[in-house]
Amino acid sequence: MDEAVSTTLEQLLNNTQLFLSYYNNKQKWTALYPMASKLAEQYRVLYSKQPFALQSRLTLYNPSYSYATNLVVSQSVITAALCKSQNYNSALSELYIAATLIEHLCVGAQLNKLCEQTPFQDSDKKIWKMRHQLAAKVMLASGDSAKPVTQLLAKLNKYKQALVSSPTIMLYDGGITLIALANIISMNITSNTANKHISLYKALTDLYIRTPNLFALQLIKSLIAHLGPLLPGSRVLYAEQTMIYLATDAQQRHVLISTANPNKLTWYRVKATLNDNPKQWHCTDKTISFKVFNSEHVKPQSELEIDKAQSLLELISNIKLQHEYSYKGLSLLMAPHPLVIANLCEAVKPYNKEHQPAKDLKHSLSMVGYYNAPAIIQRVVFEQLVNVTPHPLQAYVTNRLNGLVKIMALLVSKNDHDQFEHITLPLYAYAHFLLTQCGTQLSRKTLIDDTPNKTLSAPICSFFGVNAINTEQLTQQLTLLLSDNPWTAALLEAEQTPKKHLTEAHKLWITLKVVAQNVFKPELSLTPWQQQTLNEQLKILKWHNQADFYQQLESLELFNSI
């Protein structure tokens, strides 16, 4: 039998307070990162199953816990809500929630002083200034597994300041932006002794007006849409009584409780416009704080979530299985995917002398012909698959991927036998793998060592800031998606085949990476082997004038986006 929601919720809060207390016991430090990871998982899972119970932490301040604990709980809930509103996967969500839990680990005493408006001593000021470095040091006691979270903490203070600064300071890491946003909001909404805190909606409104950061603005809008107009735990005025709002049911009726009778709560379901006060308030009643969320009345609605990525993966599978590229067959398969059809109409423009888009699916197929259609259709579907896979660096990954695709298209543009859409399909599948399986490792860095590997070329993942990947898992996923594409095997083999044993098919991928290194990490000179491979392959690819190739490469206007 499942544990009662109230029990799970109370245990989560108790464990959060216990986690924060372990900082004072150095013998516990090695256990802190695994504990933070487990707590982050519990927050994510409970939020996905019982969002109202956790959202109520943003309005119900529990005096049984310290101010620091209430603050960390609020910030963890906001982080979980932000991740849910963006549809981030479990690994990414748990990393960000863990960073939120860890951020205040070393300054619990200082946070409580802030709440009481007690002046900081010099030692407090020093600890406060170094809080993120101290937290990172404690986490690294658990080993290298904590490195991703310490990298988030390293820039967190800078991001917090930049989110509310003018003039605009460019911020490039969406994950740190999300954590900083959750911090600013929680610091503003958590109840304090001076009663200077504000409601969540007021905090979001103020921040929306102040921040110049576009990603932060998008996060705020998504969070408001996700939470809705009323927060569980808010005090509302109904029938001339102050009641407590808990949830809204499938029929859009608000679930309220009245505490007018001290011996028994009275439950209401009403359809009305409510005047609410979502400002956090002290709640000492365990029934209101925890037990009401055991009720069937506040069960979250079972929403039918459409998994866009899964829908596209099924389309890829169906096209591959049926080998169906006739208009009649494709129109049936693609009918549920109007955006794919619209993108296909755009993708066929290079096959039109006037460079005009097609009018519809039938026109698209007639423009490109039966031979070219399969690769173009697959490319459009794979491109959309990457575009709908949520990640804070999704725009960057897409931009870098498009750069690699353009380079490959240019390399093979003089070859009449090989269609660039067919060759580049594995790149889209590779990018999708990175977004879904390496989401916590992705960064804007180009991780090619200054000291070249004498045996292997740098892997594709290094252009997306990922140092190493599970090659077995990568091979399995790419083969599953593109088993009928010979360039997939060539790409995978080129990542692991020693330089002495490379085939011509392998060397095409090596050439792509050499040119990409020139573009995205121009400060790193090519090795003699790279230069020789590039020269040989350009000739094979019918680029007899290298200056012509470089001139056309420059016209692509690729750049190393930060």
Feature annotation, model-predicted:
Residues M1-K126, K137, A141-K147, L491, ...:
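Generic N-terminal leader segments that precede the first folded domain
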Residues A31-P34, K38-Y67, N192-Y208, N213-M243, ...:
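Conserved alpha-helical "signature site"
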Residues Q75-C83, A135, M139, L181-I185, ...:
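Buried hydrophobic packing segments
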Residues V73-Q75, W128-A162, R400-K406, V466-S483, ...:
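Metal-dependent phosphohydrolase cores
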Residues A260-V298:
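Glycine- and charge-enriched low-complexity intrinsically disordered segments
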Residues N87-T100, H104-A225, P229-S234, Q241, ...:
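Metal-dependent catalytic cores of enzymes that make or break cyclic nucleotides
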Residues Q252-T259:
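Short, solvent-exposed secondary-structure boundary/capping segments
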